[in-house]
Amino acid sequence: MNKYHISLELPKILLTLSEMTSCEEARLAALSLQPSGDFFEVQKRLSETEAAHILIAKFGAPSFGGLINVNNQLSRASSGGTLSMRELLDISCDLRVIRGITEWRSKSAGMDTAIDDLFNSLYTNKYLEDKINNAVLSDTEMSDNASPALKDIRRHKRLEESKIRDKLDGMIRSPKYKSSLQDAIITQRNGRFVVPVKAEHRSEVSGMVHDTSGSGATVFIEPAVVIEANNRIKVLESRERDEIERILSELSEEAGSFADTIKISCESAAELNLIFSKAQLAYKMKATMPIINSRGVIELKKARHPLLDPKKAVPIDVSLGDKYDSLVITGPNTGGKTVSIKTIGLLTLMAECGLFIPANENSSIAVFKNVFADIGEEQSIEQSLSTFSAHMTTIVNISNSVDESSLVLIDELGAGTDPVEGAALAVAVLEDLRRKGAKIAATTHYSELKEYALRTN
């Protein structure tokens, strides 16, 4: 992130935006969002946010919950790989979310919006969604109805298990084995049905020992009368695994055949999620859509710093770039000077990200290719004062980079040195920046700088 954007606290706004998203792709996109210095790109971004803002007002927000990045899974499937049950369910979940978004959009049929292209890139696939859901019940469970063969295998398996239980039930109820059994229960060891036998009565129960208790007092025996039935179950379980693998392969092949449209749909849905999150942030901040221009003009009406309590923040009116290109803000310490220039800078960056701004309607924001800031920290919201040396290093770096498409914000210009020298230095810096065509907002407590501002256009 640009260090000037950090000093203006844009990352905090983007963090708040990211917390309003529903999917990881949109969250990461929010956190990495960069202001654009291109007028038409900013116009496009704001138009998209406006479209979502209007749709939310009329129909409420669509749900993006459950959207997952399945690009890797789809790539594997389209290359012939077999997906797990969890991976197939993730694809089905995305298809459900996409279907839900398109159904929500149908409420506004006939409305033309700036985000129609994204909505039109959502491809529903109820066929694949249902096919996966009808076959896969959970991460580890395949439905009996996934295929006729699987249903038949499991039916035979249940019959064999029932026969074994009947035989073992008869055995544990028989007086013949009452004294031999540790408990009158049927359990399993190594996937085979066994009964718990007292170790000292081991010879009284014919069968195969599969396990011994920790104390050695109990042995778990598979009685001879059920060995063949247990063997048949093992064969059926092997066939069951093979059939499940075949079904997973078939479903994966189906998913792979639709990989391209699903990827496009998921990408469009994630982008829509970000746009609607911008609109929801606007509602949260009671923000409005700024009027943007490429003339370097900023006209803010009752603007508020978005990170301050709106009940306590003092709104400001700002005019810069129309009648004059430099704005010098004066006043005592703790008078709100730093917050004022931070507000100018942050709202500019927000607009360039496609975000509405906390200001009255018809406020104007210019699109700048670069926004530079040297924020002194006496009035900083959270950080400490930088040294004069660091302050001047930043000023020099800014001076070397500015042009007529730049906005420069400087807090306590010339502070940290002798007042007379500091005032002279401040005037020289402003003259240099003005000569290069930059729009400037600076704060100061030097009376000389106030006088300079009054006699300068």
Task: Name each model feature, range by range.
Residues 11, 43-49, 64-67, 95, ...:
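Amphipathic alpha-helical transducer elements in NTP-driven molecular machines
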Residues 151-201:
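Extended, Lys/Arg-enriched charged tracts that mediate electrostatic binding to polyanionic substrates
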Residues 237-271:
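Non-transmembrane, heptad-repeat alpha-helical coiled-coil rod segments
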Residues 285-288, 293-457:
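ATPase nucleotide-binding head domains, primarily ABC-like/P-loop NTPase cores
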